[in-house]
Amino acid sequence: MPLKIVSAVLMAAAILIGMPRVAGALDPRWPPGPYKYVVIEQELKDALIEFGRNINVPVKVSDEVKGKLRGDLGAGSAEDFFKRLTSGHGLVWYFDGSVLHVNSASELRTEVIDLGRILPTDVVSKLTKLGIADPRYPIRTTPGSGLISVSGPPPYIVLVRQTLIAMARQVPQGEDTRVRVFRGSSG
C-alpha cells in the first residue's frame, strides 16, 4: 500500500478515535441544578422555545416538530428535561455552538459530496477542529475516493456543506475546486 494511503488511513483513524472527546463541546452549557417546568397543555414547539429562553440558549425548532405536552414532565436537570422531550417525541437535535436546532427524526438525511481535490481526512479534521463534527451523525470517507457521505439533520448537513465550500475556496488556483452534493435519504 502506498505511503500516502497508509498515512491517510492512520490520520482518519486518529481523528475518529479522538472524536468522542469533542462531544462535550457539542452540547450547550446546561445550567446546574434541577430544572422544573410545569405544563398544563402546551404545544411541543412552544415548550422547546421557552426551554431555550429559560437556559439562555436560542432554540430553532423545525416546522415538522408537532405535538402537545400534558401533565407532569418530572424533575431533573435541564439536560435531562430536554433529552426526555426530544427522545420521547421522535426528535433529533444539533447544537452549532450558538443555536440549538431541533428537528423531527423524519428529517434526517444523507448526502454524498464530491470533494474535488480536497482530501476527505482534511474535511474530517477541519470539521472536528471547528467543533462541527458530531459523533451522533456520521461522516463516512473512503481514502482515494474524493467523496464523503454525511448523515444528520438539515442544520448539520448545511453547516458541513458551508464548511466544504469555504475549504474549496482555499485550494490553490488551477486545481479542481468543485464541491458536488448528491442528496439522498436515510429512511
Regions found by a protein language model. Give the residues of each.
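Bacterial N-terminal signal peptides that target proteins for export
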Residues: 1-9
